[in-house]
Amino acid sequence: MIRAENITLIRTGRRLLDDVSVDLKPGKVNVIIGPNGAGKSTLMKVLSGEMRAEGGSVTYNNVALPQFTPVQLARMRAVLPQNTQLAFPFTALEIVRMGAVAQGSRAPEEQARRALARAGLRGFEQRSYNMLSGGEQQRVQFARALAQVPNSVENGEARALFLDEPTASLDIGHQISVLETARDFASGGGLVLAILHDLNLAAEFADQLIVMHGGRVTASGPSLDTISDETIARVYGIGGVVGRLPARHIPYVLPQSRHR
């Protein structure tokens, strides 16, 4: 379990995170939603160990995050950042291999090839990363994360995937494929934390939704309880857009319905 308690982070006089507390459990897909500037990526960076907050604490299985070395953290969790651009002319295989090396694999190239296949990129091994489309680059970076945590559980402890807008550059087919792979990782006992702007995908795939606004968590729980007209109006400033799919009781957001 990853637990954050009373996280506060201030930069250039601005409070980016304000007394944020979350519990992330293995076996679950946790999704953060909220408007631009809500603090979503900042919270993920604090939870993954990339940034340190001024106040509060983060623990992995009851051990304080600062107690882990970078090598230990690299073997416990993998991060797909929002920005996937690189300045150097690596091949797709070389980039994904970096994830396998960080994990300490004894066969990093083989592990990288398997991860590329899981991301639907078999045959891309020798393609130049900088010549790929934005969506293909996104999937290569997703494969790198999969190579870094190839198994949901290692030595009895859950591994974690941190995915910052993993569907941002993808077509609908690959959006669903990436999220299904993430869900499979969670189903195997791993922990997934993703940031999504597509509320319909968030509603479908999240076991726990975390709604952020103004650096605070304003709601959390199953999508059926958290995605409502009231929440959308308060957080995004539009109203009358949420419906329900009768068969599975999954909420869906239809922006056109605001014109009723």
From Swiss-Prot:
Name by which UniProt lists this protein: Hemin import ATP-binding protein HmuV
Superkingdom of origin organism: Bacteria
A Gene Ontology cellular-component term: plasma membrane
Limits of the ABC transporter domain: 2-239
Source organism per UniProt: Agrobacterium fabrum (strain C58 / ATCC 33970)
Protein's membrane topology: Peripheral membrane protein
Single GO molecular function: ATP hydrolysis activity
Annotated keywords: ATP-binding, Cell inner membrane, Cell membrane, Membrane, Nucleotide-binding, Translocase, Transport
Localization of this protein: Cell inner membrane
Keyword flag Nucleotide-binding: yes
Complexes and interactors: The complex is composed of two ATP-binding proteins (HmuV), two transmembrane proteins (HmuU) and a solute-binding protein (HmuT).
